[in-house]
Amino acid sequence: MSSSWGGPIRISVFGESHGEAIGVVLDNLPAGEPIDPQEIMVQMERREEDLPQVVSGLLHGKTTGTPLCALIRNKDTHSSDYDKIKSLPRPGHADYTGFVRYGGNADPRGGGHFSGRLTAPLVFAGALAQLYLQTR
C-alpha cells in the first residue's frame, strides 16, 4: 500500500496516530496560487481540533511551486492504553495488515499509519484542491 497518490499533482500522507505529527506533502502545485487559510480551516474544523501548520511551499499567502508540506501535531494521545494488546490484532482494524505489510515494525498504537486520524491531512489536501478548482 502506498501513502502517495496522484498524477500531475502528487499527494503523500505521513505519520502515525500516536507519533509526534501527521501530515501531507503536495508536490507539483502551480506557483503563485493564492491560499486562504480561513477557507482551509472551514474544512479542517469538520475534523477534530486539527490545526495544520504549513512548513514549506507557501510564502506570503501564495504557493511557491515547491512541495507544500503541512504538519498536524498529535495531542492528547494515550499510548499506554495499547500496551496490553500490542501483540493482539484488533478485529475491524488494520493491525494485522500493518504487521504483515511492515514485517512486525508498524506502530500499532491508535491504529498507527492506518488510523482514521490520517484523514485530517487528506481533508487539508482536499481543501487546497477545492480552492484551486474554484479559480478555474
Regions found by a protein language model. Give the residues of each.
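Generic N-terminal targeting/processing segments that precede catalytic cores or assembly contacts
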Residues: 1-136
